[in-house]
């Protein structure tokens, strides 16, 4: 059954969702044991939910079988109150439909469905693509994922509004880098659509114009601080929220000094989590960048 998502104060997926890295062994295989340990650590340190197999999880280099096995391992280990959302997007509609069906059948709490990349469909094509996905698993809550910098295609608010006719489309990860995106979505779609910042550095500004939370990379490292920032903002302690926002800005910037998830994997390694190197064609963080990152981590 699709939950009531109309309460701005209580978004179904929660407020801090960690876009979790996919750990790899030295041989480059998925390290399921470490994924279990990391996901539980994240839940215990501020995360309301875990997003698997998204951009940060290196979904383009994971097979569908690996993605399924990763979900089964993580979901089976976590407390039931922690939402587990699986990336099921593809630029092939039939593949996205099948992946979303499988996520639902396997017990996922939700699916993250990215705007189709490379083939650059028009808005009508995007509407039909997401309609097919929504119809394929009508009881699975969906989060749309708009990240035009990676996909080359922008999902417009008017199209999102049309898609809200499907009761399982509850939210959107807004990762265009534009604060105005939240304002536009709220104006057209209202409060029934939960808007999540897709950028840690824009979380506080986006909260101020109606976002409900964040799909975060930095929460691997500072989940409790992000939680305090959101709670401070909600309770009217804006000065404290701003102080946390400003303190964490160097980290937010460092985690995107090169392509995500290269820096966060290096940061986790520096913090004692041997999550392995990114899969090719991504490459490890350079030594110079790693020194910069290490300095920032020690200053937190």
Curated annotation (Swiss-Prot):
Binding-site residues, pyruvate: 56, 215
Domain of life: Bacteria
Subcellular location: Cytoplasm
One Gene Ontology cellular component: cytosol
Listed EC numbers: 4.3.3.7
Catalytic residues of the enzyme: 145 (proton donor/acceptor), 173 (schiff-base intermediate with substrate)
Gene Ontology BP, a term: lysine biosynthetic process via diaminopimelate
Family indicated by similarity: Belongs to the DapA family.
Name this polypeptide is given: 4-hydroxy-tetrahydrodipicolinate synthase
Organism: Prochlorococcus marinus (strain MIT 9312)
């Amino acid at each position: 059954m699709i939950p009531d998502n109309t309460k701005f104060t209580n978004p179904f997926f929660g407020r801090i969702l960690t876009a979790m890295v996919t750990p790899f062994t030295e041989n480059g295989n998925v390290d399921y044991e470490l994924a279990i340990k990391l996901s539980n650590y994240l839940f215990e340190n501020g995360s309301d939910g875990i997003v698997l197999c998204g951009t940060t999880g290196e979904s383009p280099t994971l097979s569908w079988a690996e993605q399924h096995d990763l979900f089964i391992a993580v979901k089976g280990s976590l407390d039931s109150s922690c939402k587990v959302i699986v990336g099921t997007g593809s630029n092939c509609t039939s593949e996205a439909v099948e992946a979303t069906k499988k996520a639902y059948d396997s017990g996922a709490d939700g699916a993250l469905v990215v705007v189709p990349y490379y083939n650059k469909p028009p808005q009508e094509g995007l509407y039909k693509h997401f309609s097919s996905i929504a119809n394929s698993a009508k009881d699975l809550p969906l989060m749309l994922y708009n990240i035009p910098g990676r996909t080359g295609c922008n999902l417009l608010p008017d199209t999102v509004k049309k898609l809200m006719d499907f009761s399982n489309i509850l939210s959107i990860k807004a990762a265009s880098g534009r604060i105005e995106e939240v304002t536009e979505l709220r104006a057209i779609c209202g409060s029934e659509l939960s808007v999540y910042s897709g950028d840690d550095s824009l979380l506080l500004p986006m909260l101020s114009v109606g976002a409900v939370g964040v799909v975060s990379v930095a929460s691997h490292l500072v989940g409790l601080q992000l939680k305090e920032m959101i709670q401070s903002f909600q309770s009217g302690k804006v000065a404290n929220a701003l102080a946390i926002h400003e303190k964490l800005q160097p980290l937010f910037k460092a985690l995107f000094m090169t392509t995500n998830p290269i820096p966060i994997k290096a940061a986790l390694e520096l913090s004692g989590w041997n999550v392995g190197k990114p899969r090719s064609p991504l490459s490890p963080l350079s030594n110079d960048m790693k020194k910069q990152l290490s300095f920032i981590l020690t200053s937190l």
